[in-house]
C-alpha cells in the first residue's frame, strides 16, 4: 500500500492557553492537488508551519511519504517544497539570481530547470529585474518558482496567489495542476479563494478552531444530503417565511424578484413542485442545483469573512 504524501497523526499545538491545533489527523493522498480550508484563526497556517518545523508541535506526529520527521528530519524534507506567507528574497538581486542561489543550496538544479521555471511562472520577461521592483503578485510567483525548483514530490503552499489578479491566479494554479497531472506532484494548498479551490483541487480538508470538521473528494462533499432547488415563478412569489414553516424545507433565499433558492432536507424536487402548485403558485422553472464549495464552507464553519 502506497504511503500518503503527508500524514498528520493527532497533531496539537498550544501557545500558552491558546489551543491553535487540536488533535488534527489527516492523510494527503499522493499525486493530487489538495485544498486546506478554514476561517481566519482556524489553525491553517500553524499547521503548515509545523510540517517543515518552522513551528514545533506540542504533540503528535508528522510523516512525509512514510518518513517520520522525528526520526529522520532531513530525509523527510528532502522531497518537500514550501512557501508559507509572503516569501522573502534578496531584494537587490534579480529574480533569476535569487533562483540561482536557491539552486546552489539544492544542488540538483540545472540552468535549464531555472529557464523552464521562470517561463512557467510567467517571469521570463522580468527575470533580470531586481526583486525590489516586483509587485506582490510577482513575488508570489517567484516564491512558487523557488519552491518547485528542486522538483519536490510534495509542495506546501500557504495562500500562494495573494496579490495576483484573476488571470495570474488561473495561470499559476493551472501550472501547478499541470505538474500534478504530468509529474505526479502533490500540492497541499491553503487558500481563501474557494471558487479556485473547487475548480482545481481534487480533495479538500476543512478545519475550524484547530479541529478537522470535514474532508473528502470535492465531488463527494458537494453531493449534499440536502438539495438546493432553484425555482422561478410566473406571477406571485411565495413568502420565504411561509415556506420555511414546512419541515421538509430547510432554507429559502431570494435570488431575484421571481426566483428563490429552496434548500430541501431530502432530494425531492418533484415533491417541491407539487407542493408549490397545490399552494396556488405558478412555477415556470425548477432545477436542482448542487452546492458550491463556498456554500459548503459556510454551512460547516459559519464564517462569512472568508467567503
Whereabouts are the PLM-identified features?
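Short coil/loop linkers at secondary-structure junctions
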Residues: 68, 109, 124, 249-250, ...
